[in-house]
């Protein structure tokens, strides 16, 4: 079932866009890779198998993969290229013990036209050809879809017609980050992202929006909603 009896015509997701209209953005797939070894006292490391050393080999392969990603996946004209980043590593229990476990977390940004699980499988195949010991690729704990501009063009134009009189000329753009717009769009509701403020201030210690831009955005939201029919 659905929560709404009538499907909305359009969703405008309020995020800081500098009053531009985001019509496309990248998605994200995140997962863990784990290596195992054999613990022993660090005074005789040859008695064990160092899981961090094993992970270092995987990290070198992932860096190689990230460098080649621009050739493997064509960049999107609005959102730029696909990326891969290792953002977290954890391993070992003490400095005098050879570690028997190591875990990393991977962030793979996908561009419109890519699927999250395909990106995961692509990395798995790349590592399989290069790594000769056992490791675990844990199923992704996040697969966030992209937002494509194939369904929202008409609505973006209509929203723009209310932006220009209030705030002057602005643009339809693509961005590297993701938003909830992709989830709404996946549900069959054409979606765009629009709001006051800059993404440069998002997730910082001092988030702020200028009063003028906030007032302009409020007027644009009102005019668009009042005339959407």
What are these regions (language model features)?
Residues 23, 30-229:
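Metal-dependent amide/peptide-bond hydrolase catalytic core
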